[in-house]
Swiss-Prot record:
Domain BRCT, residue spans: 615-701
Catalytic reaction annotation: NAD(+) + (deoxyribonucleotide)n-3'-hydroxyl + 5'-phospho-(deoxyribonucleotide)m = (deoxyribonucleotide)n+m + AMP + beta-nicotinamide D-nucleotide
Region: Disordered, residue numbers: 1-21, 603-623
Enzyme Commission identifier(s): 6.5.1.2
Annotated binding of NAD(+), by residue: 64-68, 111-112, 133, 156, 189, 302, 326
Gene (name only): ligA2
Protein name (Swiss-Prot/TrEMBL): DNA ligase 2
HAMAP family: DNA_ligase_A
């Protein structure tokens, strides 16, 4: 394993005329691949969950750097293994697929590209008059004015639609309710300054809640509250407007400032504004970071002139006239108080350090991943060690550089557990990632996965703390137990304490909703039932292929290893694992069958003269169909990405995630995207989501 990097530069310090690049690749893993299909699927699920939490909750599942790193690793794994992604993480223009809302944006609210340092330097060299703005750690909103009066405010959401938050942003500092007399839109960042972040955390702690992890999560959590608890604590900084679309950027911002808006640029110190060129401005801002009264993790460079912006144009996910620069990580010393273990959904041993809480770049770090046994032993980190905690473009938070010179004489090297800490069974140590294969050690993760919308039975409301509470009460030991729950049992499930010290329960109303979701889940297609069993190598893709090949759960259970191996993409080794796990899961499958869960229907032979499936070629083979971009607003809009994939295969086609010479049809919601351009180059037929929905309905494919 390669050691963690030893040389790190402070924020904003040029090195050899450039800025210090920082690359903390995970030792032994880097950007290469995941160890198994389960790890890859778990990573996708984690990223999708983090994307939703980013826009809608006060929980910091990942910050930007962690999310970007995980997304890059997912893409690297897919490329290395020839996987055609079924998720929309690479297509979304918001934060990784966050949910939409009830307000449609006039134009998509796009993210900014965050390229490597060399690309930022190249951008600055090409555009020496580019202007700089702080990259504020807040929440993007768009605000519509008619006749100078605020009429609508919405969160970014998925970039196309967002939640209406008009009444929750009235009176925000820097965001006037009346400004001018025209019709226009202003976009900007809703954020917490340091003083108001402290006030918000005091309110939370008085209510018996943990403080917000950082300012951005504080904004998300506070915006979700509609009772006025946090009134007057938000601030707003504008970064774009349509008030005069022919005006240069600086002129537009100055016009907004004259109307009473705070702009992002107006928050910068004069030393930054006086810098001679873009990279000098980045250096000046880096030197001033700790003196600002708000959290920022980077700088944004924007082309100033409207003419040059129009010439550069827009990409499918981000404008081409702006880039974001991420400052090198800030490090703070802390102490490893303990080394803790956890068993994940697939039985993987996860190891983390519990740290003396320390604020690193605006958020409190209390835990850090220690990756795996081999990494931890190679780094020789011990309980009681003083280490450096940092945030970088990796799975974070992380620690490195244990100070051996500060160790107590009684310090002992860390020893890994000899058996699973939960069930005392031996680990499978055949790979770098140790696993416990006993089912009881990963129930929580399996239930959450089984209930998920993206891959499982789509039981809304049953993940997270509710699932854990059911497990702790021994009401649920596997996915089949969900279908034997009673409404009264659910209503009495304890979820913690109320603000007054009482016991908070799920309640009858929420229990009734979940029971309705469980009943609905009984009719999910066979492929989702297979995937919900959380068996290795039975994720969404193979779940669909197994369901299509065997038709019923009974036929799948009766299949031989050789029959399983003949399914596209499975092969002998995976077939052996699936065959063995089907045997182990026989009691669970029996309970699901008894509960009335769909077990599929036998494949019927086509009737004489019957028409071929709608998405097949003249020779009867399935058409390779790729879907990219948003399908919102079309007849397909109610379907998740997995739902669209299932529709394609139900109609006889093969769902694919990338455009190639074998692609027969591209369903594209974003003309001009990379997949659109590649399909044009290859002469592949391209249709809109509306056209595709009509074609499938009419059978004229």
């Amino acid at each position: 394993m390669s050691p963690a990097p030893q040389n790190r530069q402070p924020s904003g310090v040029p090195v050899g005329g450039q800025f210090a690049a920082t690359n903390h690749a995970e030792p032994g893993i880097g950007l290469a691949t995941f160890g198994s299909e389960e790890e890859y699927q778990a990573a996708v699920t984690t990223a999708l969950s983090a994307a939703k939490a980013y826009e809608t909750t006060d929980v910091e599942e990942m910050n930007d750097a962690e999310f970007d790193r995980l997304l890059a690793k997912i893409a690297s794994h897919e490329a290395a293994n020839g996987i055609e992604p079924e998720h929309d993480l690479h297509d979304t223009i918001g934060h990784g697929g966050a949910g939409g809302g009830d307000v449609e944006h006039a134009t998509p609210m796009k993210s900014l590209e965050k390229p490597g340092e060399d690309a930022v330097i190249e951008f600055a060299a090409k555009h020496p008059k580019a202007v700089i703005e702080p990259k504020i750690d807040g929440l993007a909103i768009s605000v519509r004015y008619e006749n100078g009066k605020m009429v609508r405010a919405a969160r970014r959401g998925d970039g196309y639609t967002g939640e209406d938050v008009t009444d929750r942003v009235r009176g925000v500092d820097g965001l006037p309710e009346m400004a001018g007399d025209g019709d226009y839109e202003v976009r900007g960042e809703l954020y917490l300054n340091d003083e108001n972040k402290a006030k918000a955390n005091a309110i939370r702690q008085a209510a018996g809640k943990a403080p917000f992890a950082n300012a951005r999560n504080g904004v998300a959590g506070m915006l979700n509250k509609q009772d006025g608890s946090y009134a007057g604590l938000f601030s707003f900084a504008a970064y774009s407007t349509t008030i005069d679309e022919k005006a240069d950027h600086l002129d537009s911002m100055q016009q907004l400032e004259g109307m009473g808006f705070t702009t992002a640029r107006s928050l910068l110190p004069q030393s930054v504004l006086d810098a001679e060129d873009p990279m000098a401005a980045i250096a000046a801002l880096g030197a001033e970071r700790k003196g600002l009264n708000f959290l920022m993790d980077g700088a944004v460079l924007k082309v100033n002139t409207a003419a040059e912006r129009a010439e550069l144009g827009e990409g499918s996910r981000a404008p081409k006239w702006a880039v974001a620069y991420k400052y090198p990580a800030v490090e703070e010393p802390t102490v490893i108080e303990d080394i803790e273990y956890n068993i994940g959904k697939t039985g993987r041993l996860s190891i983390r350090a519990r740290l003396t809480p320390v604020e690193v770049d605006g958020s409190v770090v209390e835990y850090a991943s220690l990756h795996n046994v081999g990494h931890l032993q190679a780094a020789d980190m011990r309980i009681g060690d003083t280490v450096s905690a940092y945030k970088a473009n990796d799975i974070i938070p992380q620690v490195h550089l244990p100070r051996a010179d500060l160790r107590d004489e009684s310090s002992q090297p860390w020893q890994p557990p000899s058996v699973c800490p939960q069930c005392s069974e031996p680990f499978d140590k055949s790979t770098e990632l140790w696993r416990c294969h006993t089912p009881e050690c990963s129930v929580s993760g399996r239930i959450s996965y089984a209930a998920s919308r993206d891959a499982g039975l789509d039981i809304e409301g049953l993940g997270g703390s509710i699932g854990d509470a059911l497990i702790e009460k021994d009401l649920v030991k596997d996915v089949s137990d969900l279908f034997y729950l009673g409404e009264d049992q659910l209503a009495e499930v304890e979820l913690g304490e109320t603000s007054t010290g009482g016991t908070r329960t799920l309640g009858q109303k929420n229990a009734a909703k979940i029971m309705a979701e469980i009943e609905k889940a009984k009719s999910q297609p066979l492929n989702r039932v297979i995937t919900a069993l959380s068996m290795r190598f039975t994720g969404r893709t193979f779940g669909r292929r197994l369901a299509a090949e065997f038709g019923t759960m009974e036929a799948l259970q009766a299949a031989t290893v050789s029959q399983l191996a003949n399914v596209e993409g499975i092969g002998q080794k995976k077939a052996e694992v699936i065959h063995e796990q089907l045997k182990k899961n026989a009691p669970v499958i029996a309970k699901l069958r008894e509960a009335g869960v769909n077990m599929g229907a036998p494949k019927a032979a086509p009737a004489a003269g019957a028409k071929a499936p709608k998405l097949t070629k003249p020779d009867g083979k399935p058409m390779n169909v790729v879907v990219t971009g948003s399908v919102k607003g079309s007849p397909l809009g109610s379907l998740s990405r997995s739902g669209v994939q299932e529709l394609i295969e139900a109609k006889g086609g093969k769902a694919s995630g990338s455009v190639s010479k074998t692609t027969d049809l591209l369903v594209c919601g974003e003309p001009g995207s990379s997949k659109f351009l590649k399909a044009q180059e290859l002469g592949i037929r391209i249709v809109t989501p509306d056209e595709f929905a009509q074609m499938v309905e009419d059978g004229e494919v």
